[in-house]
A protein has these predicted regions:
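A short beta-strand motif that forms the metal-chelation/ATP-contact edge
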Residues: 18-23, 149-152, 216, 222-236
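ATP-grasp fold ATP-binding core
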Residues: 67-68, 92-111, 132-147
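Phosphate-binding site of ATP-dependent enzymes
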Residues: 113-204
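Protein kinase-like catalytic core scaffold
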Residues: 99, 157-158, 212, 224-227
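Glycine-rich phosphate/pyrophosphate-binding beta-alpha loops
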Residues: 27, 109, 229-243
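A long amphipathic alpha-helix within ATP-dependent nucleotide-binding catalytic cores
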Residues: 171-222, 246-265
């Protein structure tokens, strides 16, 4: 018998009552989602998003460095700290504008600024450094849409195109009184470019075996990973257009498999060590 219970952060003390925790809220390190994921893992629950995935995915600076170190294609970029303010003019001499400046833990296009000049680079860096010790400066890759590849335990669940908001360079436009977003297209993953799928799978292998949404840009034959999201959207009528209810059944089946695996007694070797 499967009992599902919708809980909130007020139920953190009850986590030991459950076998699994499925977090459906944007995660952050300084947040109850991080605390509850760690506590759930400590209590032996199956967890999505697990603490390791949250730690690796929510920090764009760390993720960029990880991707580059492991040979996963990512936009060209520079990691900046506050002491770099004095050398921004020198750095600007080596750049082609526009560039994109990001805080480590931005989400839904927040904390991401398009930089069009060296003067704006200095101005925006000073502003963002007021709240963040590190920033990521990356090349700007204009595209009509971003790919979002949904992956669970190394298997592709969905392939979507998220289009830029009308008249804006990002998927989400926060410039007005309300947030606007672009359209979408979800397709059978078999129809998505093989290079996009393979690159997304390579990226998630660096993170874990949980549920991820990999954002990629494609420009001609070039495919780069923008980020790996540990808490991807699963919206009715968007990401589930192809699989329908089977999308959610596959996720629940993964939880069940992991829970049953945890319940299996560990086999203790009965082999005796050879005597001398």
């Amino acid at each position: 018998m499967c009992i599902r219970d919708r809980i909130t952060r007020r139920d953190e003390g009850r986590l030991a009552e459950f076998d699994a925790l499925f977090i459906r809220e944007t995660t952050r390190l300084d947040h109850h989602t991080w605390r509850m994921a760690r506590r759930a893992e400590h209590e032996g629950l199956v967890v999505i998003d697990d603490p390791q995935s949250i730690l690796r995915c929510t920090n764009k600076v760390y993720l960029h460095a990880l991707l580059r170190a492991r040979g996963i294609p990512a936009p060209e970029g520079h990691l900046l700290n506050r002491s770099d303010l004095d050398r921004l003019d020198t750095l600007a001499d080596t750049l082609t504008f526009p560039q994109v400046l990001k805080i480590p833990d931005g989400a839904f296009s927040r904390g991401v600024v398009k930089i069009n000049s060296r003067a704006q680079l200095t101005e925006e860096a000073r502003r963002l450094f007021e709240d963040s010790a590190l920033l990521l400066l990356q090349e700007w890759m204009p595209t009509e849409y971003d790919w979002r590849i949904g992956i669970l335990d190394g298997q592709v669940l969905f392939a979507s195109r998220y289009y830029m908001a009308r008249g804006h360079w990002q998927i989400y436009d926060h410039s007005g009184g309300r947030v606007r977003s672009g359209g979408f297209e979800t397709m059978d993953p078999a129809r998505a470019p093989e290079k996009v799928i393979k690159t997304a799978l390579r990226a998630t292998r660096l993170i874990g075996n949980g549920l991820y949404g990999v954002d990629l840009k494609q420009s001609g034959d070039r495919v780069v990973v923008i980020e790996v999201n540990d808490n991807p959207n699963l919206d009715v009528g968007v990401e589930d257009v192809v699989l329908g209810p089977a999308l959610y059944r596959r996720i629940m089946a993964w939880f069940l498999e992991q829970m049953e695996r945890k319940r299996q007694p560990r086999q203790v070797s009965t082999r005796q060590s050879p005597t001398s």
